[in-house]
Amino acid sequence: GLLDSIKGMAISAGKGALQNLLKVASCKLDKTC
């Protein structure tokens, strides 16, 4: 239903944000940016 799709969108948005944070963090640690 509607709640499920909203939940799914929130989860995938959260995953995307986490992946971006991890990319930035590893980039800073490895100094590869």
Swiss-Prot record:
This protein's record includes keyword Iron: no
A cellular component annotation (GO) from this entry: extracellular region
UniProt key word Mitochondrion: no
Tissues in which the UniProt entry reports expression: Expressed by the skin dorsal glands.
Pfam family, one: Antimicrobial_2
Subcellular location per the Swiss-Prot or TrEMBL entry: Secreted
Keywords per UniProt: Amphibian defense peptide, Antibiotic, Antimicrobial, Disulfide bond, Fungicide, Secreted
InterPro entries: Antimicrobial_frog_2
Cysteine pairs bridged by disulfides in the record: C27-C33
Recorded superkingdom: Eukaryota
GO biological process, one term: defense response to fungus
Primary location recorded for the protein, binned into one broad class: secreted
Entry similarity comment: Belongs to the frog skin active peptide (FSAP) family. Brevinin subfamily.
Role according to the record: Shows antibacterial activity against both Gram-positive and Gram-negative bacteria and against the fungus C.albicans. Has no hemolytic activity.
Protein name: Nigrocin-1
Organism: Pelophylax nigromaculatus (Black-spotted frog)
